[in-house]
């Protein structure tokens, strides 16, 4: 696709209309009786641009034209460009934690605490609601000890997060798919995340509900979301099993899921974290996948 041709205008109406025909039926099946239906604010992770050569500014132009509202994990230097095109930082990093050495490493808490506080300040500065903190690898540690350690450090900073109005969020990952390189993560099942949230006991303690990982480890995507919405501040989507586009080449019905999200009253971002499939155009895929969630 010629980038100038695309940037001159995007014609997504026919696809949106085609998808819209069945939305009222799906909504009726998923809508809780007391929920206020919320429009879905869509964001993206950098993975959706795999194999492309667009500059960051060109990416922002494309996303803005398609109707996206945010970008996950931008650098602080990229924020002015985001805002130039009406996009928001949906989630930021900057806590000192990593997939290897995370919140459960008690010996690193003295390092993590000031970093998390600084990350909260950064989120306030750039206008981002969510700060991600990673639980890390077990390396022989029991899940119980991991939950205790994670809750301990998060409890030390929860007051500051509450004061500043910033969500602290942990992301679930799967431990089954070797190619995803996360086989030893302590937070590989929803129950562990809910447990930590309950221990911390703060309205600012949340999780990133990554539907790709949840489907692999827990399943029951919609019910788990609806039953634990108070602990969810951010959602990631990707096709299962390939982690590619969220269309009908994959096992999850994301149109149905999108209606369930909208009907639940969830008002956070839903971020695309898939990679374009072989031979597929990233921009066309973004357009199509945006339409699937645009309910």
Ranges and model annotations:
Residues 2-65, 127-129, 187-209, 213-295:
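Histidine-acidic metal/acid-base catalytic patches
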Residues 9-19, 34, 101-206, 216:
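Active-site acidic/histidine proton-transfer and metal-coordination neighborhood
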Residues 48-50, 75-77, 95-98, 137-139, ...:
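Active-site-proximal loop/turn and secondary-structure-junction residues that shape catalytic pockets
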Residues 58, 77-80, 84, 114, ...:
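Alpha-helical scaffolding segments of alpha/beta enzyme cores, especially the outer helices
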Residues 58-78:
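Catalytic domains of carbohydrate-active enzymes, especially glycoside hydrolases
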Residues 69-70, 88, 129, 167, ...:
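Residue-level detector of anion-binding/catalytic polar loops
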Residues 84-90:
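Glycine-rich loop at the start of a catalytic domain that most often binds anionic cofactors/ligands
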């Amino acid at each position: 696709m010629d980038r100038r041709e695309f940037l001159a205008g995007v014609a997504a109406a026919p696809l949106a209309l085609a998808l819209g025909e069945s939305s009222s039926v799906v909504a009726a099946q998923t809508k809780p009786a007391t929920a206020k239906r919320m429009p879905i604010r869509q964001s993206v992770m950098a993975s959706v641009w795999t194999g492309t050569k667009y500059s960051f500014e060109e990416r922002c132009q494309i996303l803005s034209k398609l109707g996206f509202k945010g970008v996950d994990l931008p650098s602080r230097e990229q924020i002015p460009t985001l805002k130039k095109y009406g996009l928001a930082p949906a989630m930021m990093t900057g806590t000192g934690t990593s997939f290897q050495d995370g919140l459960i490493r008690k010996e690193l808490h003295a390092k993590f605490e000031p970093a998390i506080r600084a990350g909260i300040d950064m989120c306030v500065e750039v206008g981002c609601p969510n700060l991600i903190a990673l639980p890390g690898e077990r390396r022989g540690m029991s899940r119980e000890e991991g939950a205790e350690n994670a809750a301990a450090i998060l409890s030390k900073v929860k007051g500051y997060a509450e004061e500043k109005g910033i969500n602290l969020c942990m992301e679930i990952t799967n431990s089954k798919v070797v190619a995803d390189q996360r086989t030893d993560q302590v937070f590989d099942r929803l129950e562990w995340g809910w447990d930590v949230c309950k221990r911390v006991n703060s309205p600012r303690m949340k999780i990133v509900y990554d539907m790709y990982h949840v489907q692999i480890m827990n399943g029951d995507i919609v019910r788990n979301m609806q039953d634990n919405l108070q602990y969810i501040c951010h959602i990631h989507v990707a096709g299962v099993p390939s982690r590619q586009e969220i269309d009908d080449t994959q096992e999850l019905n994301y149109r149905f899921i999108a209606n369930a999200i909208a009907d639940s009253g969830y008002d956070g971002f839903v971020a695309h974290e898939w990679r374009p499939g072989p031979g597929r155009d990233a921009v066309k895929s973004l357009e199509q996948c945006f339409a699937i969630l645009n309910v």
